[in-house]
Design a protein with these regions (language model features):
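Generic hydrophobic, helix-prone segments enriched in Leu/Val/Ile
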Residues: 120-121, 161-163
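Short, charged, surface-exposed secondary-structure boundary motifs
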Residues: 153-161
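Polybasic low-complexity intrinsically disordered regions
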Residues: 1-150
Length: 163
């Protein structure tokens, strides 16, 4: 899971992206398919730990998250992501920019933990409910126990017999 770390410095400027090739406007014609750029989670499963860590933003930035009561909380600073075992013993930790979503750090944390411990289960909350994380966990022969994220108002209750 992650926690906020407030920073005193100003939030850093985003790297201005290089000029992108202009895309064709409008809807694609029949039979035409446009390439989608792969998301960060799609790339992380095949890359090394070093490349995954270098891809994550590490500068001071604004972050926002909802607490358990639904109240939004925002801060300027960083986010500390920690991978723990039973008894809240930390195995690996990564400090990222506050704007990085928790799910984007799940695979690098798992890669760091692989070299340190052997585990059979991956227990995560609803923020990590992504097919890429499920597939990565199953590929390592772990059993993913990830709470379902209620998308569009429908929450699936976890049934232990089916998971």
């Amino acid at each position: 899971d992650s926690t906020s770390v407030k920073g005193r410095e100003k939030s850093c400027r985003k790297n201005t992206p290089k000029k992108k090739v202009k895309k064709k406007r409008g809807r694609p014609k029949k039979g035409e398919e446009r390439k989608k750029e792969p998301r960060r989670l799609e790339l992380q499963g095949t890359r090394t730990l070093e490349k995954n860590l270098n891809d994550l933003a590490k500068g001071c930035d604004w972050g926002c998250k909802k607490d358990s009561k639904g109240k939004k909380m925002s801060w300027r600073g960083y986010k500390l992501h920690i991978d723990c075992v039973d008894g809240d013993i930390p195995v690996s930790a990564i400090v990222t920019s506050a704007s990085v979503h928790d799910s984007q750090v799940a695979i690098p944390l798992a890669q760091m933990g692989e070299s340190r411990i052997t585990n059979l289960y991956d227990l995560m909350d609803a923020a990590y409910d992504a097919p890429e994380i499920h597939n990565y966990s199953k590929g390592k022969e772990h059993i993913p126990i990830i709470d379902d994220n209620p998308r569009r108002g429908e929450k699936k209750e976890m049934d232990p017999a089916k998971k």
